[in-house]
Amino acid sequence: MSPPTEGRAPGSRPIAGFAPAKINLTLHVTGQRGDGYHLLDSLVVFADIGDRLVLDPDAALGLTVSGPRAAGVPTGPENLILKAAAHLGAVRGAIHLEKHLPAAAGIGGGSSDAATALRLHAQAMGRALPDDGAALGADVPVCLRGKATRMSGIGEALTPVAGLPPLPAVLVNPGVDVPTPAVFRGLRQKENPPMPADLPGFATPTDCARWLATQRNDLEPPARAAAPVIDSVLAEIAGDPDCLLARMSGSGATCFGLFETPAQAQAAAETLSTRHPDWWVAPTVLR
């Protein structure tokens, strides 16, 4: 699915936005602050699949949801989309969310939706984007960028990353919720080395995958302990002969596999979907 063109039409016609999946290619936990927040060093990229949002600026403030992953999505004030509207002080504007990404899956679906809602409401109100998006969640600032970024601190330190080729990939979620707080509690070592100060450039996905294999997702071991099905997901992805790297994203349970070509990723996705029709499987390109 390709992102729709964003922009406000003349008058008060609806404004469309795209909320891509966020993927942590690496996630190094480097410490923990006195207030409990964990310090991270993560290479973040975004998929070409995601949720779609449409804002009707003149309608009453509200949220409706449809789509293949709509079940269980709250439409009350606890939803980050409505929290984003409140954060900007919006008093009007109905958003319809077409939900394609699994929730609580380690791919930033809620944060990406919130970031897109901020953009749409800010555009409708003629306002600049706020610089305190982190008040809605640690992943919201990087989702506002929506491009390859090195994210550090508690998510507030963002550095653009150049020299990263498009990465054909398969995303797989087994349909198991892995609560993020439980994963962090299961982390045995909370002071781990960061990525190198200077990230290398890569000519091909294979070059990138080789380097990524020397890095980590420190949340993967505790997530696998909390949800052993992640072991099976990673084994299935890595078992494809064309897979360059298999790793978990974020705090799980979504995992990804990297491939050299989109055709290889598509073929792997078809095989995985056939073997596990109950899993969410999606080929994509990460950028």
Swiss-Prot record:
It catalyses: 4-CDP-2-C-methyl-D-erythritol + ATP = 4-CDP-2-C-methyl-D-erythritol 2-phosphate + ADP + H(+). InterPro entries: GHMP_kinase_C_dom, GHMP_kinase_C_sf, GHMP_kinase_N_dom, IspE, Ribosomal_Su5_D2-typ_SF, Ribsml_uS5_D2-typ_fold_subgr. Belongs to the GHMP kinase family. IspE subfamily. The keyword Kinase applies. Pathway: Isoprenoid biosynthesis; isopentenyl diphosphate biosynthesis via DXP pathway; isopentenyl diphosphate from 1-deoxy-D-xylulose 5-phosphate: step 3/6. ATP binds at P102, A103, A104, A105, G106, I107, G108, G109, G110, S111, S112. HAMAP family: IspE. It comes from the Bacteria. Its EC number is 2.7.1.148. GO terms for molecular function: 4-(cytidine 5'-diphospho)-2-C-methyl-D-erythritol kinase activity; ATP binding. The active site is at K22, D139. It holds the Pfam family GHMP_kinases_N. This is 4-diphosphocytidyl-2-C-methyl-D-erythritol kinase. Catalyzes the phosphorylation of the position 2 hydroxy group of 4-diphosphocytidyl-2C-methyl-D-erythritol. GO terms for biological process: isopentenyl diphosphate biosynthetic process, methylerythritol 4-phosphate pathway; terpenoid biosynthetic process. The keyword Kinase applies.
